[in-house]
Structure formats: structure tokens, C-alpha cells
A protein has these predicted regions:
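Glycine-rich phosphate-binding loops at beta-strand->alpha-helix junctions
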Residues: 7-33, 44-45, 154-155, 332, ...
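An N-terminal assembly and electron-transfer interface module characteristic of large anaerobic redox
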Residues: 42-43, 60-875
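Hydrophobic/aromatic-enriched cytosolic interaction surfaces used to assemble or bind macromolecules
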Residues: 34, 48, 57-58
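PAZ/PAZ-like end-binding module
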Residues: 39
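Phosphate/ATP-binding catalytic cores across multiple sugar-kinase/actin-like superfamilies
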Residues: 1-11, 803
């Protein structure tokens, strides 16, 4: 795949080759996309063969013809059938008198491989596997119990710690077997999300393996933070953190699955978490202290051994003048099934293989990148890329990534840029459950050969600038136009008025459209989540329109700093603006958090002044949305509800601008009466809508699913923005109780704030009840209590536990039909939506959930067909 942002880089004449280019439609599509003349010979599929022939002729050193070689050769032919897979290819083996064999007919190189045998290189991954899992098999004399640990995900990072901790507490540890394809296939039916990464899919097989071993308990910790260096944060991705919740939902074997919340970022908190868990198993405090100290030491020794061995391999390779490949990936890419033994393939070619673990103790700060360093494993990969970029040509970089890996949609482009800016090549191998070693070998051989040519031509090549353009703008925001993405028809119209009170000139971008998709795909990685594609596209589209002066305009974007990919939107927009030709346009971060580092600092807002206004505006807009959707399904004349919605939002904007936000309550009472007047007295089928926050509120992003349902006479019961913010009171309480964080303020401060806000919610509930179809706001702690039955409240990534809480709340109201709107491949919703669907249906068997995934290429027909089937179920 060719990622091209500026077609002029290709020139006016383009020559294409390869079998794909025999397709006239492909060639014509390229002409239309580039606007250039595309030239193709009559045999494009043979151009590579011609190239090989020309290369061979230029390097020939004998005058023996091909016919002479064949006539002088003495060989025997044997017909074989390969048993490497179900294809059972017919393979011919040619055995020559000198003892060598040549195979033909094989469609891959899994079993029968041609090529000379080289002295194999060192493979750090074999050493790492043994160092990780080759622990003492000594079993406590009288074990308290047998705890099984799946050989999966972050156990490839922390197994030495957990094995030592549990064993030292008198608990026998049983590890699941090595990953096998048969184990994966037998448990594939348990995978709740088809597009989740392969490493996650393997977890079910490992859990089944432990169930078969009849362990007493299974240990799958809910690890939120890994150990932190100089990076901004050290989160795990939502899949690594929360997959235990999916396992609990689908694998009910009667064996308890323990998933205590864990943070390796703070050793004091880590001890409390371990202590609380072990005490629940009957372990004494004195034994826990000793075991914890020992486990910490063993984990540190493991990390130090990895670093030392990597450095030793590198030193030996340089002494022997061997090529070295830094094969980077997540810790679980150490699993030979996940990586398809790529490290062995490299080593068999005589290459010495090291891993990203070589930078574990570097303490190197990630610089000159458009990337929020929030995830632990990607941070290490990026540090390794920076380290590799500073090395000589004898060290090259290859990255392993799994299909469906959310963070890598941001990471891969930055790794590529870091290497290319420093004159290094970048090779990316994308892995899933399909084993295609032959294709990967070809890419690796291509890398090696290209490096030989690279060395030959390096002398005349100029190094590229390593600087990343960052525009800082500290004091002039109030004199500039600030653009913000369009979010929802209900709160977005009020945002400029709210920010005007803070002294800022804020303007909403236009609602996304098909052009936004095109610009977004051009300037963002095509695997980022759909909302990111649209937001980047909206921003670039605005500047390309010529309506805004990039020197006098600023872009602002919210930033949560959590485990979700949305925290990287600010970096993504910066990168897009730079590549689109607007490097001096600042991008501001709107955040309450202090853990986010942004060289373009956030707005200085007097939140004490603005928050009461913002709260009233959010509550008012949520109430109007409740009025609108209930009335739209019952309106006496088509369009009445929409006109009232727009009218009352416009009036609210005027009140806010006039600093009369307290009058919103009176205006809401008037709105309730007028919405009552346009409604027919009738019952309608009801559908709840949940999902990713941008999709469920933005009409274009969801392809107007909510509008489609309303047109069918269905009352949509919407999610509300209020709950999204109110969940922070629950989140903070849960994080402190789970020892994920220390309390920064006394509890009474939060309790007082909660009471003040809850009182305001009560006032809006009272005014809203004047509309006869109004459904009042629920208490967020009551919703959390329902959610706790199906998922850990530490699941605070993406929509977090709030999404299943909303579904449970609908069920309590008698609404058993719910549409869940998700970006395709959303890593958070793999856990909090599809992942716990079975658990929700355990409590409410009649619950009917339709999950719809969206991206820029989703079929309108497919969405409509699925909605039609869903609507039929309502009748």
C-alpha cells in the first residue's frame, strides 16, 4: 500500500509494474487519483523477472550457457506431498549429485525451503522466552492452593514478578502451555469481537488449558499501569488491561477468575494492591512483605538480564561484523505463534536479532514526535526506534504489529518518521492468525538486499532534518479565531457562547461530510478510529477552503490523557496540519488533567467562573435532546420537533451570551410546554442508543442512524452528556479504593462538589418533568452499582463502565432494544461493549443489542439492512 499525501511528488509520468497492473481498472484508478499519465508495458507481471535477468547478466562470470548447465547436471526427481497444511501441495524434489536439493511446486516455504544454509545468528527471543518462563518448578511443600496463570498478553512482561510473589506465599503456580493453533481454533467461538487482535483471541485457549488442568483459581490481573520512566504515562492498552472482563463474561467454568486492579507505576500502591489480594486468599501480612520484596527483586533482575544479553549480542555481532536487526514489538510478540517465528527466520539468515528491551534502562526521553507517550509498550518501541536511528548501518529496525492494534495506528507513522529522518529504513510486519512465512521471508530478504544497495549509494546521500515543526503560541489566543470540531446538534451551538464568557472567539467547524472523510484519510493513518479520521478531515478541510488564515487561527481539541486512542487526537491534528502545509497553526489541548505535556499549552480559563455556566448548558442541552427525540416520534406535523429544538437552542445561546445562564431553567419549562403541544398522545416502541461518544452524538459519523429510527416512528432514548462527566466522581472514588492513585484532595471536597452538581441536576429534572414523556437523569452512583455486576468499575477507558451501565439502565426502564454505535476496531469497546454483552444478557435475557461498526468505507446498504432486521424485531 502506498500512502501519498501530495501526488505531485510522483511527477507527471508514472511507470507501473507487477501482476496487479494487468488490471485496467487499477491503472485507470491510479490515473484518476494522481491526474498523471500512467505507463504500463504489455507484460507488467514479468518486469521483476526481467530485472532479475538483467541483474544476473551484469554479474555473470562464466560463459557457460543455460543449456550446457542443464545437460551437465546429474539429478534425480522425486514426487512428494507436503503435509504442512490442508493444501497438501504436490512438490518435486530434485536431488543433485553434490548432495543438494531443490524443491518446486511448493506454494510457501513452511516445510520445503530452497536456499543455502548459513551460520545462524543469535536470537534474543529464544533467550527471552526461557528467561521468562523457565522458572524454578519447585512447588511449595504444602501449597495453599493451585493458581493458574495464562501464558498471554502482559504475562510476557510481568510473569517473573507474579510467579515469585505467589510461590513465596505458599501458592503453587501453574502456567498454561505454549500457544498452539489447535488451542486457538478450539476456543475461537468464545471471541466476542471479530476484529480484536490475535494475541487477545489466544487468551481463551490458555484459560481453557488451565481449566483442563483443574486449577483452583485463575489469575488474570487488571493491570492499568506498567512501570514508568520519563514518559508522560505508562498505561496498558484497554485490551491488555481489561481482557479478563471478557473472559469472565464468556468462560463460566466454575473456577474463580481473579482480576485485581494493579498499577506498577507506584511501588507503595502496588504493595497495597498485592497485599489486599493475597489477604483475601488467607496469606499473612509478614509473609506478603517478604514475598513482595523478593518478587520485586526478581523482576528487576529479569529486566537487567534482558538488557545485558541484548548488549552482549550487539557487541559480539559488531566484533564479527554481523548484521543486527532490532526486532521490536509488544512483550507478547515473544510468543512464537504470534510472531510466526520471524525471529528464527532472521536468525537462520545469519542475522543477529535483538529486541526493544535493549532500551529498558536508557531513560531516554521521547522527543521530536507527534505522539502522546501514554502507553507503556509503544513508548518502549518508540524509544528503541530513536536508539536504532542513532546507531550505525549495522543495526536495522523491523517492527512486529498485530492486525487490529489500536495504538499502532498512531505509533507506526512516528516510528517510520524517526527512522527515515535519520537515514534508516523501516520494515513493518503485520501479523494475525494466518501463517505466511514465505511472504515474510521475501520481505526480509528484500530488506537485506536493499541494505546492500543502500550502503553502496550512501556516500552521496544527504541526511534529512530530524526536527519536528512545533508552533508555540502562548499569549495571543484572545486575539485569534479558535476552531473546535462539531460534536453534537445539542451542545455544539452553545459552546461559542460559553467560551465567549471566558474571553475567547470560538467557532464550531461545519458538520462532517464525505469531503471530511477524504481529507482525513489523506492526512491521518487509515487505521486510526473513525472519529479521528473525521476530525482531522474537518480541520484540514477548513483551512483548504481558504476561509481561515492559518496565521491568525488556532485549533482546540479536548484531551483526556486516558487509555483510549482519543488522547492522541491533538498530536494527530498537529501532524496533519504540518503535512498539509500549515505548520505554524497551533493546536490547543482542552483538558483538566496535569499529566499531559503539550508544547502548545491549553487555554487559560477561569473554570470557577465558567463551570457553573457549562453545567447548566450541558443539562439544558441534554433535556432538549430528551424532549426532541420523544416528540419527533409523536409530532403532529413533520418538522415541528426540529424547529422547536433549533429555536430553544438559539434562545439558550442568547441567554448565555447575556450572562443569564440561570434563566435556562425557566426557558426549559417553556420548552416542555411547547413540546407537549406538538405531541400526539400515543405509545411508541423505544430504542436506547449507546456507544462511542462522538459516534452516538454526531449525525454524520453514525450515518444518521438515530434520524432513521425516528423516521420509522421509533422513540430514541438517547445517552446524555451529563453522565459522561458525572462518571468522574465514581471513577475517582474507585481509583482511590483500588489503590490505583492516591487521593490528591480530601473526600469532603469531592462530596461537596457532587452535592452541588446533584442539586442542579434535581432542578433540571423538576423542570423537565413538565414534559410528559421526560425520562429524568439517574444518580450516577446507582448506575455504577448496576454496572459493577457485569464489569469492573476500573474499566475507565473509552466510554468505560458507563456503556454497560446505560444498557442496564435502559433495561430497568423496560427498554430491551439497544443500538451500540462503535468505530470499527475500537479497542475500548472490544471490552466494554461487545466483550460483556453475554454477561448483560445473563441478567436480562430479553435484551436485544445491535452493534454497528463504522468507518469511512462502511456500506450504507449493510447498515440499513441490519437496522431493518432490528426494527422487525421490535414489531
Amino acid at each position: 500500500m502506498l500512502k501519498l499525501k501530495d501526488v505531485s511528488e510522483l511527477g507527471k509520468h508514472i511507470v507501473v509494474q507487477g501482476g496487479t497492473m494487468r488490471n485496467d481498472a487499477v491503472v485507470r484508478a491510479l490515473e484518476q487519483l494522481t491526474g498523471a499519465q500512467v505507463i504500463r508495458c504489455d507484460m507488467p507481471e514479468l518486469m521483476g523477472a526481467f530485472g532479475c535477468a538483467i541483474y544476473a547478466r551484469e554479474h555473470c562470470n562464466t560463459l557457460v550457457s543455460l543449456d550446457e548447465i542443464v545437460s551437465q547436471a546429474h539429478y534425480s526427481t522425486h514426487l512428494l506431498h507436503c503435509k504442512g497444511c490442508d493444501n497438501q501441495c504436490q512438490v518435486f524434489r530434485y536431488h543433485f549429485d553434490n548432495g543438494k536439493n531443490y524443491y518446486s511446486g511448493n506454494r510457501c516455504e513452511k516445510v520445503f525451503t530452497n536456499g543455502s544454509k548459513e551460520q545462524p545468528g543469535e536470537n534474543i527471543y529464544r533467550f527471552k522466552n526461557e528467561l521468562l518462563f523457565g522458572r524454578s518448578k519447585t512447588v511449595p511443600e504444602k501449597p495453599r492452593m493451585v493458581v493458574g496463570i495464562p501464558r498471554s498478553l502482559n504475562m510476557y512482561e510481568n510473569f517473573p514478578f507474579w510467579h515469585t510473589l505467589l510461590t513465596a506465599c505458599g501458592i503453587e503456580v501453574r502456567l498454561s502451555g505454549e500457544s498452539t493453533y489447535s488451542g486457538y481454533e478450539q476456543s475461537a467461538r468464545m471471541v466476542m469481537s471479530d476484529n480484536i487482535c490475535f494475541p487477545a483471541k489466544l487468551v481463551h485457549g490458555h484459560v481453557q488449558n488451565l481449566i483442563a488442568q483443574k486449577v483452583d483459581r485463575i489469575f488474570l490481573p487488571f493491570v492499568i499501569f506498567e512501570r514508568k520512566g520519563k514518559e508522560q504515562n505508562s498505561y496498558n492498552c484497554p485490551v491488555v488491561t481489561g481482557y479478563s472482563e471478557v473472559v469472565k463474561s464468556v468462560q463460566s467454568s466454575g473456577i474463580p477468575i481473579d482480576s485485581p486492579a494493579i498499577s506498577f507505576k507506584d511501588e507503595d500502591l502496588l504493595y497495597k494492591q498485592c497485599s489486599n489480594y493475597l489477604k483475601s486468599l488467607g496469606v499473612e501480612e509478614s509473609q506478603i512483605k517478604e514475598a513482595f520484596a523478593k518478587a520485586t527483586e526478581v523482576q528487576e533482575d529479569y529486566a537487567a538480564s534482558l538488557v545485558a544479553h541484548n548488549k552482549q549480542v550487539l557487541e559480539n555481532a559488531r566484533q564479527q561484523k554481523h548484521m543486527v536487526v532490532l526486532l521490536a514489538g509488544r512483550p507478547y510478540h515473544t510468543d512464537m505463534l504470534i510472531q510466526h517465528k520471524i525471529s528464527d527466520v532472521l536468525a537462520d539468515m545469519g542475522i543477529d536479532v535483538i529486541s526493544d528491551d535493549i532500551v529498558r534502562e536508557n531513560g531516554q526521553k521521547i522527543e521530536n514526535v507527534h505522539f502522546l507517550a501514554q502507553w507503556s509498550y509503544p513508548n518502549r518501541i518508540l524509544e528503541a526506534a530513536q536508539w536504532c536511528a542513532a546507531q550505525g548501518d549495522d543495526v536495522q529496525f523491523v517492527e512486529l504489529t498485530s492486525f487490529g492494534c489500536g495504538p499502532d495506528a498512531f505509533l507506526v507513522d512516528e516510528v517510520r518518521d524517526v527512522l527515515i529522518r535519520n537515514g534508516k529504513t523501516f520494515t513493518l510486519l503485520k501479523l494475525d492468525d494466518i501463517n505466511n512465512v514465505g511472504s515474510m521471508k521475501l520481505r526480509i530478504r528484500s530488506l537485506i538486499e536493499s541494505m546492500k544497495l543502500f550502503h553502496e549509494h550512501r556516500a552521496g546521500r544527504k541526511e534529512q532534518n530530524t526536527a519536528v515543526a512545533v508552533s508555540e503560541c502562548k499569549d495571543h489566543y484572545k486575539n485569534k479565531k479558535i476552531l473546535v470540531p462539531y460534536f453534537t446538534p445539542f451542545i455544539s451551538p452553545l459552546i461559542p457562547a460559553i467560551m465567549r464568557l471566558a474571553g475567547y472567539d470560538v467557532e464550531n467547524l461545519a458538520l462532517s461530510n464525505a469531503e471530511s472523510c477524504e481529507w482525513g484519510l489523506k492526512y491521518a493513518n487509515n487505521e486510526v478510529c473513525y472519529p479521528a479520521t473525521l476530525i482531522v478531515g474537518d480541520v484540514v478541510k477548513a483551512f483548504k477552503s481558504g476561509r481561515y488564515n492559518p496565521e491568525e487561527t488556532v485549533v482546540a481539541m479536548t484531551q483526556t490523557g486516558g487509555q483510549c486512542r482519543a488522547s492522541n487526537y491533538v498530536s494527530l491534528i498537529k501532524k496533519a496540519l504540518e503535512e498539509a502545509g500549515y505548520p505554524h497553526t497551533p493546536v490547543l489541548s482542552l483538558t483538566f488533567g496535569s499529566s499531559l505535556e503539550n508544547k502548545q499549552p491549553g487555554l487559560k480559563v477561569n473554570w470557577i467562573k465558567i463551570l457553573p455556566v457549562a453545567l447548566r448548558a450541558i443539562l439544558y442541552s441534554d433535556c432538549i435532546s430528551k424532549f426532541y427525540y420523544a416528540a419527533a416520534a409523536r409530532e403532529k406535523e413533520v418538522g415541528q420537533a426540529a424547529r422547536l429544538r433549533d429555536d430553544f437552542l438559539q434562545q439558550a445561546e442568547g441567554l448565555i451570551r447575556d450572562k443569564r445562564s440561570k434563566d435556562l431553567l425557566d426557558l426549559l419549562s417553556v420548552a416542555a410546554e411547547q413540546f407537549n403541544a406538538i405531541c400526539r398522545d400515543m405509545n411508541c416502541p423505544k430504542v436506547g442508543v449507546v456507544g462511542e461518544i462522538f459516534l452516538k452524538f454526531n449525525p454524520f459519523a453514525q450515518k444518521n442512524v438515530i434520524g432513521w429510527l425516528t423516521e420509522k416512528g421509533i422513540e430514541v432514548v438517547p445517552s446524555v452528556l451529563t453522565d459522561f462527566f458525572m462518571q468522574n466522581f465514581v471513577n475517582r472514588k474507585v481509583r482511590v479504593e483500588s489503590c490505583i492513585q492516591k487521593s490528591a484532595m480530601p473526600d469532603f471536597v469531592y462530596k461537596s462538589a457532587y452535592k452541588i452538581i446533584n442539586k442542579q441536576i434535581g432542578k433540571f429534572n423538576k423542570a423537565g418533568m413538565k414534559f410528559r414523556y421526560f425520562i429524568p437523569f439517574k444518580d450516577i452512583f446507582e448506575e455504577a452499582a448496576d454496572a459493577r455486576k457485569v464489569i469492573s468499575l476500573n474499566a475507565q477507558f473509552g466510554e468505560g463502565w458507563l456503556l454497560p451501565a446505560e444498557i442496564m439502565s435502559y433495561a430497568r426502564q423496560g427498554i430491551f432494544n439497544v443500538v451500540s454505535l462503535q468505530p470499527f476496531g475500537c479497542i475500548a469497546n472490544h471490552i466494554v461493549s461487545k466483550g460483556v454483552e453475554k454477561r448483560i444478557k445473563y441478567f436480562f435475557p430479553e435484551m436485544n443489542i445491535l452493534s454497528l461498526d463504522f468507518d469511512s468505507g462502511v456500506s450504507d446498504v449493510n447498515i440499513t439492512n441490519r437496522l431493518l432486521l432490528f426494527v422487525d424485531h421490535l414489531k
